[in-house]
Amino acid sequence: RIGRLVTRAAFTSGKVDIVAINDPFIDLNYMVYMFQYDSTHGKFKGTVKAENGKLVINGKAITIFQERDPTNIKWGDAGAEYVVESTGVFTTMEKAGAHLKGGAKRVIISAPSADAPMFVMGVNHDKYDNSLKIVSNASCTTTCLAPLAKVIHDNFGIVKGLMTTVHAITATQKTVDGPSGKLWRDGRGAAQNIIPASTGAAKAVGKVIPELNGKLTGMAFRVPTPNVSVVDLTCRLEKAAKYEDIKKVVKQASEGPLKGILGYTEDQVVSCDFKSDSHSSTFDAGAGIALNDNFVKLISWYDNEFGYSNRV
């Protein structure tokens, strides 16, 4: 799913040239159908067709591979330099490194990784070193939380914090109750329940903002909505600040260094208003509250599919 939406984002922005796609599970005609029609984001606004064994999007012919083993994909022959690894399976340096054997020069893992360096755009992307061949783009929740946490920490200091993400359904969940390994709750029907779940998103912020390492943790509630999630960051501030001061610095960041990554709104918004929004995170000024000048609850929305795909 993220692979398809990264492709949509690439054709929408025009910043990236898609030359090849690997999908061993569906044939070319099915690829056309799945790319063209999307239950959440609507029909693709351009043209898409199958022609001469290639997927043709907006007139651009894309080479198709159907390999289960990434070492067999001839990325180099197709002219691919950067590979987006979005299967959710090959997320370690060793496994993702298989793409390099086929001629790719770099691999971006669209998930958290146990050992690959992790980067969040707008937060620690400037630490990227050109010698790195394999990197992780973290998770959608980390890419929402980290820019907000950075702005707050840079201006007021975060002593400690707890994050809750109210998260839309994703493909790992069950349509009806079913077995789910050791995570029994995760196996309950996604459309019927609010499901408490674990997330490493808050702890991962400590990897991209080292000063916050050990200061944040969090959990998730999976809720029966198809897309768009929201982060609640409740934190203690080092430096006292009125809620108006917080709004001011977030707004400034959204118009300056984090423009396009961190959004800001004072409107009376709800989750559907962020469908297909390309920001990593949009601060909801009207939804947050302060207990006092050192203890605040901050709310930020994200399209967990499309916002994340635009950062990839």
Swiss-Prot record:
The modification N6-malonyllysine is found at K182, K203. GO terms for cellular component: cytoplasm; cytosol; GAIT complex; microtubule cytoskeleton; nucleus. The keyword NAD applies. PROSITE patterns: GAPDH (PS00071). The modification S-nitrosocysteine is found at C140, C235. The modification S-(2-succinyl)cysteine is found at C140, C235. NAD(+) binds at R1, I2, D23, R68, S110, N304. The modification N6,N6-dimethyllysine is found at K54, K182, K203, K215, K248, K251. The modification Phosphotyrosine is found at Y30. D-glyceraldehyde 3-phosphate binds at S139, C140, T141, T170, T199, G200, R222. One of its GO terms (molecular function) is NAD binding. There is a cross-link at K174 (Glycyl lysine isopeptide (Lys-Gly) (interchain with G-Cter in SUMO2)). The [IL]-x-C-x-x-[DE] motif is a proposed target motif for cysteine S-nitrosylation mediated by the iNOS-S100A8/A9 transnitrosylase complex. Belongs to the glyceraldehyde-3-phosphate dehydrogenase family. Homotetramer. Interacts with TPPP; the interaction is direct. Interacts (when S-nitrosylated) with SIAH1; leading to nuclear translocation. Interacts with RILPL1/GOSPEL, leading to prevent the interaction between GAPDH and SIAH1 and prevent nuclear translocation. Interacts with CHP1; the interaction increases the binding of CHP1 with microtubules. Associates with microtubules. Interacts with EIF1AD, USP25, PRKCI and WARS1. Interacts with phosphorylated RPL13A; inhibited by oxidatively-modified low-densitity lipoprotein (LDL(ox)). Component of the GAIT complex. Has both glyceraldehyde-3-phosphate dehydrogenase and nitrosylase activities, thereby playing a role in glycolysis and nuclear functions, respectively. Glyceraldehyde-3-phosphate dehydrogenase is a key enzyme in glycolysis that catalyzes the first step of the pathway by converting D-glyceraldehyde 3-phosphate (G3P) into 3-phospho-D-glyceroyl phosphate. Modulates the organization and assembly of the cytoskeleton. Facilitates the CHP1-dependent microtubule and membrane associations through its ability to stimulate the binding of CHP1 to microtubules. This is Glyceraldehyde-3-phosphate dehydrogenase. It comes from Mesocricetus auratus. The gene is GAPDH.
